[in-house]
């Protein structure tokens, strides 16, 4: 049964012809980009061995860390994507070794008191289960889902992002979690237990009705009253200001909505996707790669966030599977994702291959804290590689 979903603004796409100045990417374009990325992945395999990269680079060089960050599985996801493209058993073996580390992490409950269980267990263990059906990978993903539902708050109907459960100062969701709830849909499908699905759906509607603004932009986070569950206010933690639109947050919405649509099939979700996507496309600079916050445009001298553009490409590609050919925006969406990915390949993909280097340059991790500004980041690497594989073949999402 459909739930109430607020109506948001739908801006017309401005100057859609800007996305058709160049031809669509050819299979040769994609293959060349994948071959280059694969070379960097192989260099990084020797560099990281069975450890993991830090979330972002410093001077375009990852440091090496253990499996304790929220970002670690994006490297493992790069390995699974590279394995799908190459068929190289050495890549598969390292990815499986990584996944055993994730099984150990969830079994021992190491640094998992947050909402990012989907980011940790989808591109790693869920990917392995979908590709190889190894029982250990399924076990790890289901344990992670059980850990994630512990953060569900009945009052407000959402998964609390961070902090002490139920504490007023921490009683909020964040837009990123639209990707994390895909782990709960997976758990429901695998176990037949609708409890996971129900929590995911409740969280989705809490997000759609509150963290997404009426003008189709998004807050980063949204607070609820822990006593009543009533909505309180939207604030940022990563964006420029509480009133601006953090580019990566907007992209999480663009991707999270079509992923959730697969399970809900509610037409209102398409309109939600369109609103958020049009808002994003209308604020791209001339080279089609977003600044780190959509409040900035050409001439602002701010940093881009290439990872946000890579995520948006994946989201548009996912929704295009659903949109009928007669949809008035479908051709523009297709042209836009080709234009954005072409820009990433041409001007943002790392071509200076060396151990520990990123696949994708010019991202932003956290502007306010000065972390990873105009650097590579591992989720940018992952979503760039995912976008390439989506264009290369009929790819079955890990999400």
UniProtKB/Swiss-Prot annotation:
Gene3D superfamilies: 1.50.10.10. Belongs to the glycosyl hydrolase 88 family. Signal peptide: none annotated. GO terms for molecular function: chondroitin hydrolase activity; unsaturated chondroitin disaccharide hydrolase activity. One of its GO terms (biological process) is polysaccharide catabolic process. SUPFAM superfamilies: Six-hairpin glycosidases (SSF48208). It comes from the Bacteria. Catalyzes the hydrolysis of unsaturated hyaluronate and chondroitin disaccharides. Also degrades unsaturated heparin disaccharides. Releases 4-deoxy-4,5-didehydro D-glucuronic acid or 4-deoxy-4,5-didehydro L-iduronic acid from chondroitin disaccharides, hyaluronan disaccharides and heparin disaccharides and cleaves both glycosidic (1->3) and (1->4) bonds. Prefers sulfated glycosaminoglycans compared to unsulfated glycosaminoglycans. Probably required for mammalian cells invasion through the degradation of extracellular sulfated glycosaminoglycans such as chondroitin and hyaluronan. It is an enzyme of class 3 (hydrolase). It holds the Pfam family Glyco_hydro_88. Monomer. It catalyses: beta-D-4-deoxy-Delta(4)-GlcpA-(1->3)-beta-D-GalpNAc6S + H2O = N-acetyl-beta-D-galactosamine 6-sulfate + 5-dehydro-4-deoxy-D-glucuronate. Its EC number is 3.2.1.180. Optimum pH is 5.5. Optimum temperature is 37 degrees Celsius. This is Unsaturated chondroitin disaccharide hydrolase. The active site is at residues 116, 176. PANTHER family: HYDROLASE, PUTATIVE (AFU_ORTHOLOGUE AFUA_7G05090)-RELATED (PTHR36845:SF1). Substrate binds at residues 116, 176, 234, 236, 248, 252, 366, 369. Keywords: Glycosidase, Hydrolase.
